[in-house]
Amino acid sequence: FDMAEHVTGLRVTSLCADLQTFHPTRKQPKHSVETFANKLLGPEDYIETPVDTEDFGAVVFRMGKRTRGAMTASQVSAGRKNGLSIEIYGTKCSVAWNQERPDELWAGHRDAGNQIFVKDPSLLKPAARTFADLPGGHSEGYDDTFKQVFRRFYSSISTPNGVPEYPQFVDGLRQLKILDAVLQSHRTRTWIGVPAFETGK
């Protein structure tokens, strides 16, 4: 939800959620495994462990009076590892971005051919250029977002009166309130309002 709110500038106002546990057991490594160690584990390295957490969620939501959204979160989609994507549909144009192809932005038009924009800092507007450190043809992705957040955090220390360009604790609190509404909606099978309050963005 945070990405949808950040990209659109709108706020989720209400939602309806459906959560599901498709796999009641999960494979748990018998021994600790380092993250990103690329160690291949065989069937003998796991034990089946019962779980009661959801592995799939579907949420429809409203952002104000006219904007609607739909979101799925899944750990059961074969072949999808860390997929994250967003699509925004307007009256004249649509845009789509996919984390697995971070340097591309797709734009769809009603009255012209579709386009794929490839990141090239020399062609970006100044406000966007500050987020691109590498020249065109050099991919920047998920791990680069942390660098950008830390850069903006440290910059705010030297200019304390500026507007923070990174998530604040209140932004995290807002996302927790949205997730509370997701759980409440799932339990009650009803639309749930999301409390409105200002965040750091």
Region locations from a protein language model:
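Active-site-adjacent "lid/gating" segments in soluble enzymes
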Residues: 1-13
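C-terminal glycine/acidic-rich active-site capping loop/insertion
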Residues: 6, 20-65, 87, 92-166, ...
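Conserved S-adenosyl-L-methionine
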Residues: 12-20
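Beta-strand scaffold of nucleotide-dependent catalytic cores
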Residues: 16, 70-73, 97-98
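Glycine-rich phosphate/pyrophosphate-binding beta-alpha loops
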Residues: 72-81, 141
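C-terminal hydrophobic helical "lid"/dimerization subdomain
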Residues: 172-184
